[in-house]
């Protein structure tokens, strides 16, 4: 089931949230990550996950390698296709640590904390969809829990162990 939603943050606001964390990504990987984020915000499509333990509405897009090259404004070459595959791997397998020592209050001001909050996660959850010849047809891409929290209308439920 697909629904359409309105995000409370636009792409530029999300991009600035990521820039604050100074992610250890090369410029090409960042360009690809931002192209995907921009498409998630632009598409406003969500997939209903009724049995989800986190949130039932997960933004999801389906992109082929060619789509990602176009969105990232990269030439359609074998080298750039390989670059996209490597970036998708890095964004969906490697874990990044986000550390906070301040929190943003409702009035927009910041408050310094007496402690640090560290969050480690991937950026995207990515599933490869293959055609009948066993070639990748497209990727189903969903933001991770951390990225969902950046959208601000999402809340993520964590299990208490």
Sequence positions of predicted segments:
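Charged, alpha-helix-forming regions
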Residues: 1-161
């Amino acid at each position: 089931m697909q629904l359409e939603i309105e995000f409370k943050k636009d792409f530029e606001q999300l991009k600035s949230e990521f820039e604050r964390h100074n992610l250890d990504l090369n410029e090409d990987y960042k360009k690809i990550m931002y192209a995907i984020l921009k498409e998630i915000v632009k598409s406003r499509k969500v997939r209903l996950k009724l049995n989800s333990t986190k949130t039932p509405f997960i933004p999801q897009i389906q992109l082929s390698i060619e789509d990602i090259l176009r969105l990232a404004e990269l030439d359609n070459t074998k080298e750039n296709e390989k670059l996209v595959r490597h970036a998708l791997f890095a964004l969906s397998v490697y874990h990044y640590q986000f550390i906070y020592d301040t929190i943003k209050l409702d009035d927009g001001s910041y408050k310094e904390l007496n402690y640090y909050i560290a969050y480690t996660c991937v950026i995207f959850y990515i599933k490869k969809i293959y055609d009948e010849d066993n070639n990748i047809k497209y990727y189903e891409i969903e933001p991770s829990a951390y990225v969902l929290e950046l959208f601000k209308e999402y809340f993520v439920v964590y299990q208490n162990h």
